[in-house]
UniProtKB/Swiss-Prot annotation:
Keywords: Cell membrane, Cytoplasm, Lipid-binding, Membrane, Nucleus, Repeat. The gene is Sdcbp2. Coiled coil: none annotated. The lineage of its organism: Eukaryota, Metazoa, Chordata, Craniata, Vertebrata. It comes from Mus musculus. The keyword Membrane applies. PROSITE patterns: PDZ. Disulfide bonds: none annotated. This is Syntenin-2. GO terms for cellular component: cytoplasm; cytosol; Golgi apparatus; nuclear speck; nucleolus; plasma membrane.
Amino acid sequence: MSVLYPSLEDLKVGQVIQAQGRASPTMPTLPAPMASAPPLSELYPNLAELESYMGLSLSSQEVQKNLTQIPDSDNMVVTSPGPGQVVAPVSGNNLGILRAEIKPGVREIHLCKDERGKTGLRLQAVDKGLFVQLVQANTPASLVGLRFGDQILQIDGCDCAGWNTHKAHKVLKKASAEKIVMVIRDRPFQRTVTMHKDSSGQVGFSIKKGKIVSVVKGSSAARNGLLTNHYVCEVNGQNVIGLKDKKVTEILTTAGDVITLTIIPTVIYEHMIKRLSPLLLHHTMDHSIPDT
């Protein structure tokens, strides 16, 4: 299994650091005059060339904040990341990446109903599966962490495969108000793309009514494989479905230098939200920033 990186920029910087570590000269066997040890800041490569190639607004000092410090030792050993390990010399321990993570496997949640007998959840059948269509803000569904696009595998021990939307809502209506047990798979139709702003604060894409319509050549968006004809579901884990483009742009502007988008193909998205009013999406969808 290969080492994993959140973005192409992380991969390139990581490769430079590893290459420099491998190229470090070994200590001579015969005694020699000891030169003064270089400061830790010089143990990592000069990133001027890399900055020019990627258009990143980053310095060696900024990268080093996200790297493990090398101990002061005469027997320094440069280690390579293990298979499957996520290495992020540029992104670091970014909260947006953590909030947007689509976890593999399935999980169980316990849902209840509010005083009106509502869960705050709407479901939609897609390709014989059952998916979360709407999570209303400040409801039991939002409190347990359900998100748009999550797949519902079971409700109270009953397999949901093949159910239509009407049956799903009927089962929820009849379920206990105190405890509804669901088995969930995280957003199988969605994927995340992590990008880095350039010196002008741009990552290189534009949207129209929530859909990605263009990607700038040579930008971080292009380098990291962002595609057109996809809708933006989340920015750094925050749901933006139903928001005006101006508001989404504001969220992107204030989101920091590392941006993680959660996107979904247009054909799936439009099927998921059919018969939902744009006003309902805008005013009732949970747009809060999730906990990590």
